[in-house]
């Protein structure tokens, strides 16, 4: 009985082995394997297709960054334009300052003249106070100091007189027999200059030469 069972088991095992070999070697099995491979490839394609939008997102992101870069570039251009406008405005302000300096021309003239007169007065005073100077030198220096004070008084008087004629400002510089007059006025003519000369002649009888110059107020 045991031998029969053993033979039966061996027979069944042999049959299973034969069927397995037949199944593997049959065309249908190959087709099944091919279909399985195609299915796997198809699944892989789906995965690849699903991952593709990620690249598209990257492109969209790059596009967004590009647009942002353009906006930044445009903003930078606007900033540059603003800087140019600011630079142009600063340049115009610099021109205004130059014009203001022209308005201060009379102040500069006066300061220069006062400095020159102050140095001259110091030199004359040094001679008067010097122990080495002779009596004649001291007397001459003193006379020059007195004359200088008189000239300064005459200049102030003439400046005030000219401004009463409607002029904004006037600068008078008397050097010996010559008087240089600078008048601040936007309008000037030969007749106006002649009128100023006649006005000065009435105040200074001994004058020989008078020069009148007009400077614009702006």
Curated annotation (Swiss-Prot):
Location in or out of the cell: Cell membrane
Record field: compositional bias (Basic and acidic residues): 48-92
Pfam family, one: SpoIIIAH
GO biological process: sporulation resulting in formation of a cellular spore
Segments for region (Disordered): 33-99
Entry membrane topology: Single-pass membrane protein
Record's GO cellular component terms: plasma membrane
Transmembrane segments: 7-26
Polar residues bias (residue ranges): 33-43
InterPro entries xrefs: SpoIIIAH, SpoIIIAH_sf
Keyword line: Cell membrane, Membrane, Sporulation, Transmembrane, Transmembrane helix
UniProt key word Membrane: yes
UniProt subunit comment: Interacts with SpoIIQ.
UniProt function note: Involved in forespore engulfment. Forms a channel with SpoIIIAH that is open on the forespore end and closed (or gated) on the mother cell end. This allows sigma-E-directed gene expression in the mother-cell compartment of the sporangium to trigger the activation of sigma-G forespore-specific gene expression by a pathway of intercellular signaling.
Protein name: Stage III sporulation protein AH
Species of origin: Bacillus subtilis (strain 168)
């Amino acid at each position: 009985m045991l031998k029969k069972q053993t033979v039966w088991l061996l027979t069944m095992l042999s049959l299973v082995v034969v069927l397995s070999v037949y199944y593997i070697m049959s065309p249908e099995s190959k087709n099944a394997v091919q279909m399985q491979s195609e299915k796997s490839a198809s699944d892989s394609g789906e995965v690849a297709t699903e991952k593709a939008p990620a690249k598209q997102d990257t492109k969209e992101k790059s596009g967004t960054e590009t647009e942002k870069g353009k906006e930044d570039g445009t903003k930078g251009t606007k900033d540059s334009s603003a800087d140019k406008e600011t630079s142009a405005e600063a340049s115009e302000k610099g021109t205004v300052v130059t014009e203001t300096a022209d308005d201060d021309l009379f102040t500069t003239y006066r300061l220069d003249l006062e400095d020159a007169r102050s140095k001259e007065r110091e030199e004359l005073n040094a001679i008067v106070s010097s122990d080495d100077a002779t009596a004649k030198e001291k007397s001459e220096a003193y006379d020059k100091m007195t004359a200088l004070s008189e000239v300064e008084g005459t200049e102030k008087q003439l400046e005030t007189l000219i401004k009463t004629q409607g002029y904004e400002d006037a600068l008078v510089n008397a050097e010996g027999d010559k008087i240089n007059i600078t008048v601040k006025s936007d309008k000037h003519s030969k007749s106006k200059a002649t009128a100023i000369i006649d006005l000065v002649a009435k105040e200074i009888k001994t004058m020989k030469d008078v020069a009148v110059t007009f400077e614009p107020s702006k």
